[in-house]
Amino acid sequence: MANPVAKRSFRLRLHVLGSKLHKWLAIFVGLQVLLWMGTGALMSFLDLEEVRSEHVISRAAQTLPDDAAIPRWLSDSDDITAITTRVLDGKTVTEVRRADGAVSLHEPLSGRILSPIPAATARSIARRAWVGPQTSIHAARLVDESVGTEFRGPFPAWQITYNDVANTRVYVDASSGAVLSARSDTWRFFDFIWGLHIMDWTQRDRINSWWLLLFGIGGTIIAISGFVLLANRFPRTKRRARHGQVAR
């Protein structure tokens, strides 16, 4: 038969150990756990369509005319992986993708190269893409390197800034004329709290950092030690209730 004194002693030691673990880890990990819960709630609250600026930026392809010219000047090229004839900024163009990843735009009949597109064309593409409240374009600049966490390529690309309340920017591929991404203050706020959530405060694209792993394990231990403390309290509560009934 188990020794009741030894059993109580073991429970007491377990309770003390669980209490210490719970207390010190809660102090160390508690703030980040609070940030996880708070940032998770905020991200759930934000409308993903608004974060992506889909309510003001359209990426729908323009319809290709029935009489569009079919390019014949590319038949002798071996390194081409894709040829697409489409409408860009109201004009028919042929997009050529090559094995090395290069993209170029051409005049369909002559093959005259049209890329990289100039600032005026990038502005016009951005104006056509805008479907929000009436606004104008504030600035256009060519970027060939990452713009913080806001845009990481491909490069070169045109950064077009609108005169709207959300400080919206679109990035237009200088090689293909495609609208690559749209960023606004809502997206920047979402990106900031995402960085807090995954504990990557600079690049905000690593979800397996040592910081996140360490605090994740710490949070798990807090939960387990909390259950240990709770389990050790239940028998005491029952014994107190039983002794109270006997006393009566």
Feature map (PLM): residue ranges:
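Conserved histidines in hydrophobic membrane contexts and catalytic metal-binding motifs
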Residues: 2-248
